[in-house]
């Protein structure tokens, strides 16, 4: 891999400056404060501004379709991340829109895609069920055909951003007696349909997600994505992308690991801790003068660097595990003030370690638990076969 610095062309340099100015104008302190308070990872005005300026369309489209070049895509994504822009759910919308275009009816794509690219239409995922855990193929939400429509009943957990979305990419069971993975069908269900109830819940890290209930929800067959009982085929590409097991592009400008944006959160917490331990107390002593602090901070930095440099699904496990381990070390180093959250008087490092500690636990669950990913690595990468669970 070539690690040399990329020299930007005058045009790309201008794009870099324009993007930074745009983000500075729209991602204000008030936007970030609201995001911390409500945990939605979404701001409608910012999202609409990104759409109006053409950023969403350029990010979604391939370069051959008029989208960003690899260099501009990297510039855009890095600057969006560095500013803590609350747009995490754009990734979900982008992936679902691509699947809709690939597997859905052209009429549906023509109706939905323009709104996606303008920012007016957002999409969310309806996979996980209350009793299903990480195995989405155990789906019990039923879709029963009734002429040209389908009647849907069931419930889904962790449907993040449903409160801001127009449609949910919903996994249903259309043949309960059929073989696993061959009885699933996908729909793009309008969330304003009668019979849908969205109930917000707050997670440990302060984010909002949702339980969504479906009671005799009628959906036209137009909204079916892919073949009847062919839902697993539709889902596979989305899951592979989420899990980080797709082949990387050869330009080398994409994120190294899956969920690498969480590595940035860890890096900022480590940087703030490193600055805090250099401060003197009233007696002129610094935490950094303690050899154990030097050792533990140095170890945290080394582990963080290793985790963010680990590729693909391996990095997904490395990041989640390292966040859990490093956050505990940082809170020990910073002492009692480390339990005070961001924007609290006298918090250590502005609460970055406290947030990392809370954020680390669900990070090991998003998109599948660490145990699921370790099994995937063992089975698919190391060729060790399927796990054999006792009992």
Cite the ranges covered by each PLM segment.
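A short, Trp-centered hydrophobic/proline-enriched beta-strand micro-motif
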Residues: 119-127
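A structural signal for short hydrophobic beta-strand segments in well-ordered beta-sheet cores
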Residues: 141-144
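Internal helix-loop-helix
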Residues: 51-119, 160-167, 304, 308-315, ...
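A short core secondary-structure module
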Residues: 148, 153-199
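C-terminal helix-coil-helix/basic helical segment that borders enzyme active sites and/or dimer interfaces
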Residues: 31-37, 282, 294, 298-347
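Glycine-rich phosphate/cofactor-binding loops in nucleotide/flavin-utilizing enzymes
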Residues: 2-5, 71, 75-76, 95, ...
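Amphipathic, small/basic residue-rich leader segments at the start of a protein or domain
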Residues: 1-91, 111, 115, 272, ...
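Glycine-rich beta->alpha junctions and the first turn(s) of the following alpha-helix
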Residues: 4-8, 197-307, 363
């Amino acid at each position: 891999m070539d690690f040399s610095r990329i020299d930007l062309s005058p045009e790309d340099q201008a794009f870099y400056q324009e993007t930074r100015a745009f983000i500075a104008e729209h991602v204000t302190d008030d936007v970030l404060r609201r995001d911390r308070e409500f945990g939605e990872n979404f701001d409608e005005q910012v999202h609409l501004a990104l759409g109006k300026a053409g950023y969403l369309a350029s990010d979604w489209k391939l370069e051959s379709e008029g989208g960003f070049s690899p260099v501009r895509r990297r510039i855009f994504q890095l600057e969006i991340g560095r500013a803590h822009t609350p747009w995490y759910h754009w990734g979900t919308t982008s992936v679902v829109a691509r699947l809709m275009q690939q597997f859905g009816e052209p009429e549906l794509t023509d109706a939905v895609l323009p709104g996606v690219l303008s920012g007016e239409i957002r999409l969310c995922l309806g996979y996980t069920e209350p009793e299903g855990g990480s195995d989405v193929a155990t789906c019990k939400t039923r879709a029963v055909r009734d002429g040209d429509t389908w009647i849907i009943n069931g419930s889904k957990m962790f449907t993040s951003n449903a409160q801001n979305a127009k449609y949910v990419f919903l996994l249903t069971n259309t043949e309960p007696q059929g073989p696993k993975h061959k009885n699933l069908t996908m729909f793009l269900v309008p969330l304003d349909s009668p019979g849908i109830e969205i109930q917000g819940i707050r997670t440990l890290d302060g984010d909002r997600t949702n339980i969504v209930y479906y009671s005799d929800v009628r959906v036209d067959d137009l909204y079916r994505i892919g073949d009847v009982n062919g839902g697993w085929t539709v889902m596979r590409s989305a899951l592979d992308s989420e899990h980080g097991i797709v082949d990387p592009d050869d330009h080398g400008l994409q994120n190294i690991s899956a969920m690498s944006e969480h590595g940035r959160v860890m890096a900022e917490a480590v940087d703030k801790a490193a600055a805090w331990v250099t401060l003197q107390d009233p007696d002129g002593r610094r935490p950094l003068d303690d050899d154990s602090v030097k050792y533990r901070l140095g170890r945290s930095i080394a582990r963080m660097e290793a985790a963010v440099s680990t590729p693909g699904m391996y990095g997904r496990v490395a990041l989640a595990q390292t966040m859990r381990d490093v956050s505990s070390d940082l809170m020990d180093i910073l002492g009692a003030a480390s339990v005070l959250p961001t924007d609290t008087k006298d918090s250590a490092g502005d609460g970055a370690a406290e947030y990392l500690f809370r954020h680390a636990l669900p990070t090991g669950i998003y998109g599948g638990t660490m145990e699921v990913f370790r099994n995937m690595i063992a089975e698919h990468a190391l060729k060790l076969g399927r796990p054999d669970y006792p009992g």
